[in-house]
Amino acid sequence: MKSVTLKELSLLLDGVVQGDETLVINSVATLEHATSGQISFLANSKYRAQLESTQASAVLLSAKDAQDYQGTALVVKDPYVGFARVAQLLDTTPKAAMGIHPSAQIDPSAQLGDGVAIGANAVIGANVILGENVQIGAGTVIGQDSIIGSNTRLWANVTLYHNVHLGQDCIIHSGAIIGSDGFGYANERGQWIKIPQTGGVRIGDRVEIGANSTIDRGALGHTEIHNGVIIDNQVQVAHNDIIGENTAIAGSTTIAGSVTIGKHCIIGGNCAIAGHLTIADGVHLSGATNVTGNMREPGLYSSATVAMDNNLWRKNTVRFRQLDELFQRVKAIEKNLNTPE
């Protein structure tokens, strides 16, 4: 079990200890469930009541919240960021693989850096390059001519098609498929003609891709996911999309082909983005937003209908269908009112 003193944490987080700085911390927990030896945090005032009753040995607090707290605290600028840093430090998540399993199938042309680990029944294709300390989980398949940067971790049953490049310090979760064909077809007299998808996928450093997400390869050029992007579970990224640095995309979102999303965007869950659009830096889409046009300015955008009583929803649905008729009636009334007698 890992452990660290509050004094050591204060140096890591540039914080100030309020209480016993020799106190030893071995894990993190919520205010409600923390016990001795654990550190918790208060980042939302609605949990203030739990602060008074917590059994945590120490709590990460802002300077304001620490003023009236009688227990041991580590005062930091942002308690939630502090919690994330401590959680990383004390993380006990097992590795995706240890050593190279004898059942792994590794092409002789593949290049493996120092410290590479490959799990059972994994397949490493021709001309693949794995950087130092890469972890390849059991059953994962890496297609030919792919490159994976150092310290990147692929969990079990990930599939990388050919010509996929991953940067350093990435995490790819189970079931993710990267580099499958984009949805490219031409229609000739009612029959679909497949367009070979000859591009690849280029993923930067510190990217995390959630379970069962799919990222299509480019039709001609590459699909690009830039540094620091985080993608939740069950997200679809289509061919030739470009996602800017440090953008976050929540689960069940679908992005059609040839979309360019800027830097530092937040895309809520279950959003749908039509193809060939541009979304500016700093755009925030709330959950279930349907994007059908370019977004040139940063800001918060929404389009989903919120939940309501079913009977009210039925009435409003009927009224929505009558909007055009109502508009024409109002327009006619206005015209008559403005007509001189």
Swiss-Prot record:
It catalyses: a UDP-3-O-[(3R)-3-hydroxyacyl]-alpha-D-glucosamine + a (3R)-hydroxyacyl-[ACP] = a UDP-2-N,3-O-bis[(3R)-3-hydroxyacyl]-alpha-D-glucosamine + holo-[ACP] + H(+). Pfam families: Hexapep, Hexapep_2, LpxD. It comes from the Bacteria. This is UDP-3-O-acylglucosamine N-acyltransferase. Its EC number is 2.3.1.191. The keyword Acyltransferase applies. Catalyzes the N-acylation of UDP-3-O-acylglucosamine using 3-hydroxyacyl-ACP as the acyl donor. Is involved in the biosynthesis of lipid A, a phosphorylated glycolipid that anchors the lipopolysaccharide to the outer membrane of the cell. One of its GO terms (cellular component) is membrane.
